[in-house]
């Protein structure tokens, strides 16, 4: 498979997860999913950075992304495209990817709290990769992708995540650049 096509295929597949992971930075806030409670170790379970509103909007915009992908495929790539999962397929896939991404982000926050890292503190790779791993895990049983796409996503996602964080910081959407 041509490298450019491989890159496009990987990004097209995972796009709802990327959107779901980015949206809470913009539309999040409100009640934290851990209700402000502490774990057995005395630290917060997850922290203030993961909220119900951010989770809801992350999943919603992930699904909207999948719906838009469906219509782009139909309009510009044709019904015989390898990317044509059908509308229902895109809704299910994007829901699984978005939910998996946000679950992975929550798990990353949970792990960071266990290591006494506060919200906003950097945890290299944990911050950049858990959302991708869980997005892929949630979706894989219904929508498997080849190993080369998985490997590519695991390599490029930290780079994309780091770059998007710098942009979000410059736009004053994040307090820290990492």
From Swiss-Prot:
Cofactor(s) needed: Mg(2+)
Keywords linked to the UniProt accession: Cell membrane, Lipid biosynthesis, Lipid metabolism, Magnesium, Membrane, Phospholipid biosynthesis, Phospholipid metabolism, Transferase, Transmembrane, Transmembrane helix
GO molecular function: CDP-2,3-bis-(O-geranylgeranyl)-sn-glycerol synthase activity
Entries under InterPro entries matching the protein: CarS (IPR032690), CarS_archaea (IPR002726)
Parts of the chain that traverse the membrane: 3-23, 56-76, 91-111, 131-151, 152-172
Pfam family, one: CarS-like
Compartments (UniProt record): Cell membrane
Pathway(s): Membrane lipid metabolism; glycerophospholipid metabolism
Class of the enzyme per the UniProt entry, highest EC level: transferase
Membrane topology summary: Multi-pass membrane protein
Domain of life: Archaea
EC number of the protein: 2.7.7.67
One Gene Ontology cellular component annotation held by this UniProt entry: plasma membrane
UniProt GO BP: glycerophospholipid biosynthetic process
Catalyzed reactions: 2,3-bis-O-(geranylgeranyl)-sn-glycerol 1-phosphate + CTP + H(+) = CDP-2,3-bis-O-(geranylgeranyl)-sn-glycerol + diphosphate
Function (record text): Catalyzes the formation of CDP-2,3-bis-(O-geranylgeranyl)-sn-glycerol (CDP-archaeol) from 2,3-bis-(O-geranylgeranyl)-sn-glycerol 1-phosphate (DGGGP) and CTP. This reaction is the third ether-bond-formation step in the biosynthesis of archaeal membrane lipids.
Family listed: Belongs to the CDP-archaeol synthase family.
PANTHER family the UniProt entry points to: CDP-ARCHAEOL SYNTHASE
Record-given protein name: CDP-archaeol synthase
Source lineage: Archaea, Methanobacteriati, Methanobacteriota, Methanomada group, Methanococci
GN (gene name): carS
